Amino acid sequence: MEPNTVIPKYNVRGFEIWGFRDMAQVLDHLLGSGPVKTGTLVAMNAEKLLKAEDDTALCELIKNAEYLYADGISMVRAIRRKYPQAELSRVAGADLWEALMQRAGQQGTPVFLVGGKPDVLAETEAKLRAQWNVNLVGSQDGYFTPEQREALFARIAASGAAIVTVAMGSPKQEIFMRDCRKFYPDALYMGVGGTYDVFTSHVKRAPKIWQNMGLEWLYRLLAQPSRIRRQLKLLKFVGYYYSGRL
């Protein structure tokens, strides 16, 4: 990334979305030549935006995060409609996580993993070490009690992790990251949902051609028809789009 490059932010329904040009720009901004940036990364798509509008607590969590990025093609198109000169690309959360892990492996950046089933987490750790020699300084599956949270925060702090990725689903992962950051602010936190499952092939992701066409949502719907109710809720976002209320 060129020195002094200013990355624009775009307001969509009150949420400030970073306008990253491409994956390389994201990586250079977060893991450039200096220390890893600290803060919280939150993937934004139409579904999460609508959920946040109906949930005051989640809305506050998201708006307090430092890095909101356009994870869904719906968000990219909304920004381009509202800001015709915007030059940004979709940054899929699963792809960003893998790119961060690869760069972390190259730079020896310490990483702590949270969430997922025990077997999936173990497979994720093994694959990260084998594939990119990632410096994993600790992990915790998603099966811990509320009483164990502070001890986990202490473990993360003691590990010296510079990147903490949390796979617990929304809004649990946003709540966890907020609370852990109060205890240990010296890391980059990223909520990754079901990314560990995809990375270890327990869940199949849409083929690249579907992703490139912006139809990953349709692929998931065809594979899991029970998602239809969730998809129908997105009609509200379509209304925002065509009525100029973005």
Curated annotation (Swiss-Prot):
The UniProt record lists the keyword Transferase: yes
Keyword S-adenosyl-L-methionine on entry: no
Pfam (any one): Glyco_tran_WecG
Record-listed E.C. numbers: 2.4.1.180
Keyword entries, A-Z: Glycosyltransferase, Transferase
Pathway(s) per entry: Bacterial outer membrane biogenesis; enterobacterial common antigen biosynthesis
Swiss-Prot/TrEMBL catalytic activity: UDP-N-acetyl-alpha-D-mannosaminouronate + N-acetyl-alpha-D-glucosaminyl-di-trans,octa-cis-undecaprenyl diphosphate = beta-D-ManNAcA-(1->4)-alpha-D-GlcNAc-di-trans,octa-cis-undecaprenyl diphosphate + UDP + H(+)
InterPro entries named among the record's database cross-references: UDP-ManNAcA_Trfase_WecG, WecG_TagA_CpsF
Gene Ontology biological process terms, A to Z: enterobacterial common antigen biosynthetic process
MF terms (GO), sorted A to Z: hexosyltransferase activity; lipopolysaccharide N-acetylmannosaminouronosyltransferase activity
Function of the molecule: Catalyzes the synthesis of Und-PP-GlcNAc-ManNAcA (Lipid II), the second lipid-linked intermediate involved in enterobacterial common antigen (ECA) synthesis.
Family: Belongs to the glycosyltransferase 26 family.
NCBIfam families: PRK03692.1 (NF002980), wecG_tagA_cpsF (TIGR00696)
Name this polypeptide is given: UDP-N-acetyl-D-mannosaminuronic acid transferase
UniProt source species: Yersinia pestis
Record gene name: wecG
